[in-house]
């Protein structure tokens, strides 16, 4: 998916669908699950109609495990939600799933159940901090499970600098993480820096050393900055912008269309 887009010089724009808290989590209230289904379908259609390439369905439970495993009910409910999205969009619309904070193997299981296209991995390589504890990558476990359930076709984005993977910006550290991600077979690397100049420097450094590695921007773009920030990147995950600045609310189809107009002019 991501490598094909890079080879074809396409920009994949993927909207974030932020769900309500899942059953079995501390902040779940009765009705949240049903609201999540309706919201996911609505947001996916808004993205599709606005011209985005796909979506990333993401749990928003407020409190998360720091390890890779999670409660069965989160996996089951996420599978149903993603399945409902799959039923309501065209076959070319890309669907990604991410059970936060770093539940990679459960996310792969969901992707398997709905013929999903990709997942996003907070810590596929390296070590990072989070509000919920230290995250230690375990790529051997991930790739053994991926092979076991035959999800090699599910692309995996490795976060190496951004919202969830905290590494700052040191070029040697950054490129070391790209090297690790490339070595184990990540489909793309994700970066994000709020300072656009630094963000573009990071893109340039990766592109110079790893010209074939797809780069995903993990945030920080809006309609005004999409063209300049995406010039050297291959894809973007877009959340708050498509929600008109109201994080976690519904996606505005018109905003998606305006963003895509800028991207298509690159």
Model region roles, listed by residue range:
Residues 96-99, 216-218:
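Short beta-strand elements of ligand-binding domains
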